[in-house]
Amino acid sequence: MYISEKAKSISPSTTLAIDAKFKQMKADGIDVVGFGAGEPDFDTPQYIKDAAIKAINEGKTKYTPAAGTVELRKAICKKLKDENGLDYTFDQIVVSNGAKHSLVNAFQAILNPGDEVIIPAPFWVSYPEMVKLADGVPVVLQTTEEDEFKFTAEAFKAAINDKTRALVLNSPSNPTGMVYTKEELSAIAKVAVENNIYVISDEIYEHLVYEGEATSIAAICPEMKDLTIIINGVSKTYAMTGWRIGYSAAPAPIAKVMSNIQSHATSNPNSIAQAATVAALSGGQDEIAVMKKAFRERRDYMVERINAIEGVSCLKPQGAFYVLMNISALKGRYIGDTLINSSDDFANALLEKAKVALVPCSGFGNDNFVRWSYATSMENIKEGIDRVENFIKLTH
């Protein structure tokens, strides 16, 4: 069967692949503990669900403008002003079917065939594939655990050439959980402005910060704002992953192009979910504080337990809800008759023998790590770490 070369170049998501295996095992009645998907285990706050029900009862079930309702786009502008100190007009906002969709629109809007996009590693697994879908070329910028998985302005500058069009910046980061300081962002912004490089700033985890605070690079200076495409949404902050609402804030010409692209691909996002998002952005934020408190407690417990296991280690993340566990010392060991040579080997053996689902970071740009998510109950975390600890003790 004929399949396009572009389609064949796209790799499957390792995150969704491991999560699918986990869910199938669970459906088969197997006692398996999962740490794969990046999804809060909290319910969507009731006031948001009530707003959706109200919208249904009021007949808000028709097409909306492709870029989203004016009401929602104005609510997003208010959020950006109040929380980030950024001034946008509603015509600079495009609401999409999740932040992932917003990212796809952004790459489609700014890339010509062969344009390069710098992506710091470890990275979220979908970034390189999205760039390839837009006929761009992903260029991986490696970071180290010793540098807290952060790249420097100097490394960024050294990676730029005549084909460089954009940088992907994800802070707080999936999968590392690291957060760039305002000073670090200022240095990065200086390089971007001097070289006229777009920054795709993925800020989906901005409210899940446990030390310090997240700063949008667009707020560094007006010149940087003109080169920034902010990507955000409500999935992580408001436990609304299934509602599929993301948004972008960009210079008006880029926003218009992104809206045009979306109008031919999906039309508008779900009208009911848009109404619910207005309520989310306008309502009380108490539930966020409750989630953050729980995530912080889980993070602290997970980090302490992992670092007590011989043969593995991890840094303490500052944000998001992930921990990267370094398994490099386990490479070359066996578990039973299975040789561990990669993060995939480790994750597959762990799932098969210990019934624990972790995400291998081969698809995240660094094969020495596996990713945990602490967006699950403390009970699951304790049980999962116990199983992993016992599993590692059996390696030889």
Can you say where each PLM-predicted feature lies in the sequence?
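Conserved N-terminal alpha-helix of the aminotransferase class I/II PLP-enzyme fold
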Residues: Y63-S96
